[in-house]
């Protein structure tokens, strides 16, 4: 009779526990590893690369007003050596300088060359205006074999002023130019350093030569330094070029008595442009906004590992070749044994496995959403995604890449290492600063991605917990948590009942009476099982005590009757 009652109780217990609903999240067999603030190599369901490594080995110029300077150097467009004759005036928003380009024909250099190059790269092109200088008592047609066109010539935008006759007196002269335009004027002039004192006397007459230039913001005097130098282009002399930006309504004045290379036209900047030094081929079939010496970077990513000196609208250069940004939840691949041996897994882990946090295992079959339910009842088993929690997580994660780009995007300009001897210290400082910035941004990039990854994983876990709490609040005392993300329901719950739990329309009062009755039956079985264990342990303890007591009594009787003797030796 007792056996029959126990069997009935166990049958009721098993029947009640047959209905179950579990919460789970999407998983894949092979996820992507990302780093967070607290841990490296966490596997997530989805992730995207944030560091661009693909380079287009061409200058993509589609949609750009591009000028390829070829053999002409950018600074040469302002003074006009023969190789720059076609570029004395131009308009462009992309300026390409080639390695073969040269700024000068007669040997010499530009003062503060790199700053002027930067100004011209951003200029959008240049236009010119005649300065209106006229000269009497001097020749204005100085020329040299170093600047050949069809014959010896000179810079197209400059006048080489000479004495009227060899060794003749060069008169003291003063010339002024007022900028009547609304934008600054670029004014360039030169100082000629003859190859010898005799040559200087022949060209400009005897005596010391002095050139003074001034405006409201500038004043400088120059004295030529004649003397032998190594020949370049057949010339032992040198011409050094100087420049200033003349504000609107300001006037520049030149006072000189020889060795002066006079400007003929002032240059005005047209607008804005990008300038790049590259020997890469132009391609009108592709578009780009970020350029470097090796070509074009076309990317929507926030970082790049291609060239630290790219210019334009570019991703930030970082030292890392890869920084993965999590765009999905933490991945816990479904155990392969679960796929192959369902019955074994039911015995080992239950029907569904475990999920997020306390919910340890993911579901690879949950393809319609990030979160969902699996249930088991008399009608069978089923899986359904929860779209609301999925969308909530997606809405908060969407745009992470764009936010990273907003934090890092910047227009970059090219600062080269083409420094003269005087500027080398400045060049070293610029290079050191650039290297330091790269170090800082490499660290910042890693930190930013790690912060976003931490937020994504915490966020997706939070949505999972919200969903779990929603189900728990609905079921109340009608179900019991098993600690693995599942609820064992104490009443018959068909597919409509399961759907009401998922839809948040479950009425716990409707099933309360049945659930309480089944819970009492289950608790009774658990209670009987508990008493049985206590009795077992009590019986075992009592038996041991009784055995020891009998053994001690027998030993005492034997010793008393002389049948047993105890000898103690010291």
UniProtKB/Swiss-Prot annotation:
What Gene3D superfamilies has UniProt attached to this entry? 3.90.20.10, 3.90.209.20
What disulfide bonds does the UniProt entry report for this chain? 22-486, 60-286, 72-84, 105-147, 290-314, 493-497
Task: Give the way it sits in the membrane.
Answer: Single-pass type I membrane protein
State where the protein is found.
Virion membrane; Host apical cell membrane
Processing and modification events after translation: Palmitoylated. In natural infection, inactive HA is matured into HA1 and HA2 outside the cell by one or more trypsin-like, arginine-specific endoprotease secreted by the bronchial epithelial cells. One identified protease that may be involved in this process is secreted in lungs by club cells.
One GO term under biological process is: fusion of virus membrane with host plasma membrane
Q: Which residues lie on this side of the membrane: Cytoplasmic?
A: 555-570
> Could you give one GO CC term from the UniProt record?
host cell plasma membrane
Extracellular side of the membrane: what ranges? Answer: 19-533
Any one GO molecular function term = host cell surface receptor binding
Glycosylated sites: 30, 46, 249, 335, 431, 503
Indicate yes or no for the key word 4Fe-4S: no
The residues forming the signal peptide are 1-18
Q: Where is the lipid attached (S-palmitoyl cysteine)?
A: 566, 569
Report keywords, A-Z.
Clathrin- and caveolin-independent endocytosis of virus by host, Clathrin-mediated endocytosis of virus by host, Disulfide bond, Fusion of virus membrane with host endosomal membrane, Fusion of virus membrane with host membrane, Glycoprotein, Hemagglutinin, Host cell membrane, Host membrane, Host-virus interaction, Lipoprotein, Membrane, Palmitate, Signal, Transmembrane, Transmembrane helix, Viral attachment to host cell, Viral envelope protein, Viral penetration into host cytoplasm, Virion, Virus endocytosis by host, Virus entry into host cell
Q: Where is this site: Cleavage?
A: 349-350
Membership in a protein family: Belongs to the influenza viruses hemagglutinin family.
Protein function: Binds to sialic acid-containing receptors on the cell surface, bringing about the attachment of the virus particle to the cell. This attachment induces virion internalization of about two third of the virus particles through clathrin-dependent endocytosis and about one third through a clathrin- and caveolin-independent pathway. Plays a major role in the determination of host range restriction and virulence. Class I viral fusion protein.
Matching HAMAP family, A to Z?
INFV_HEMA
Quaternary structure, per UniProt, is: Homotrimer of disulfide-linked HA1-HA2.
More about this protein: Major glycoprotein, comprises over 80% of the envelope proteins present in virus particle. The extent of infection into host organism is determined by HA. Influenza viruses bud from the apical surface of polarized epithelial cells (e.g. bronchial epithelial cells) into lumen of lungs and are therefore usually pneumotropic. The reason is that HA is cleaved by tryptase clara which is restricted to lungs. However, HAs of H5 and H7 pantropic avian viruses subtypes can be cleaved by furin and subtilisin-type enzymes, allowing the virus to grow in other organs than lungs.
Q: What is the designated name of this protein?
A: Hemagglutinin
Task: Please give the organism.
Answer: Influenza A virus (strain A/Equine/Cambridge/1/1973 H7N7)
């Amino acid at each position: 009779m007792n056996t029959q009652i126990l069997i009935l109780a166990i049958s009721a217990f098993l029947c009640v526990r047959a209905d179950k609903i579990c919460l789970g999240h999407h998983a894949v067999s092979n996820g992507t590893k990302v780093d967070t603030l607290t841990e490296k190599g966490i596997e997530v369901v989805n992730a995207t690369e944030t560091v661009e490594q693909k380079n287009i080995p061409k200058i993509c110029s589609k949609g750009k007003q591009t000028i390829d300077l070829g053999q002409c150097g950018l600074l040469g467009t302002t003074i006009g050596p023969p190789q720059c004759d076609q570029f004395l005036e131009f308009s462009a928003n992309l300026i390409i300088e080639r390695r073969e380009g040269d700024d000068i024909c007669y040997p010499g250099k530009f003062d503060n060359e790199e700053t002027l190059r930067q100004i011209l790269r951003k200029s959008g092109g240049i236009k010119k205006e005649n300065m209106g200088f006229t000269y009497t008592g001097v020749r204005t047609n100085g020329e040299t074999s170093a600047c050949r066109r069809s014959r010896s010539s000179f810079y197209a935008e400059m006048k080489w002023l000479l004495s009227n006759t060899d060794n003749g007196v060069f008169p003291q002269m003063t010339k002024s130019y007022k900028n009547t335009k609304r934008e600054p004027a670029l004014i360039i002039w030169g100082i000629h350093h003859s190859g010898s004192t005799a040559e200087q006397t022949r060209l400009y007459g005897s005596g010391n030569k002095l050139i003074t230039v001034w405006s409201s913001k500038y004043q400088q005097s120059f004295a030529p330094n004649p003397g032998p130098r190594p020949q370049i282009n057949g010339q032992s002399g040198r011409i050094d070029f100087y420049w200033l930006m003349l504000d609107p309504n300001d006037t520049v004045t030149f006072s000189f008595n020889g060795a002066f290379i006079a400007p003929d036209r002032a240059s005005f900047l047209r607008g804005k442009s990008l300038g790049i030094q590259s020997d890469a081929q132009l391609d009108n079939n592709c578009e780009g906004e970020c350029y470097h010496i090796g070509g074009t970077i076309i990317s929507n990513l926030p970082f790049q590992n291609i060239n630290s000196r790219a210019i334009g609208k570019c991703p930030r250069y970082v030292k890392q070749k890869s920084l993965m940004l999590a765009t999905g939840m933490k991945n816990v691949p479904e155990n392969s044994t679960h796929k192959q041996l369902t019955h074994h897994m039911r015995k080992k882990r239950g029907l569904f496995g475990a999920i997020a946090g306390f919910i340890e295992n993911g579901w690879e079959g949950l393809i319609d959403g990030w979160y969902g339910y699996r249930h088991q009842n008399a009608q069978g088993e089923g899986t359904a995604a929860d779209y609301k929690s999925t969308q909530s997580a997606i809405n908060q994660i969407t745009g992470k890449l764009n936010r990273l780009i907003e934090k890092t995007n910047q227009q970059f300009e090219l600062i080269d290492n083409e420094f003269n001897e005087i500027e080398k210290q400045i060049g070293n400082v610029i290079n050191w600063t650039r290297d330091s910035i790269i170090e800082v941004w490499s660290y910042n990039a890693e930190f930013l991605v790690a912060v976003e990854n931490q937020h994504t994983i915490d966020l997706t876990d939070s949505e999972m917990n919200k969903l779990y709490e929603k189900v728990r609040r609905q079921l109340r005392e009608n179900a019991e948590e098993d600690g693995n993300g599942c609820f064992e329901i104490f009443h018959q719950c068909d597919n409509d009942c399961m759907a009401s739990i998922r839809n948040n329309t479950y009425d716990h009062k409707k099933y309360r009476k049945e659930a309480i009755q089944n819970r009492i039956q289950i608790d009774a079985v658990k209670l009987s099982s508990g008493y049985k264990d206590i009795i077992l342990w009590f019986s075992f303890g009592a038996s041991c005590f009784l055995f020891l007591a009998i053994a001690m009594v027998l030993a005492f009787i034997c010793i008393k009757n002389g049948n047993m003797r105890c000898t103690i030796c010291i």
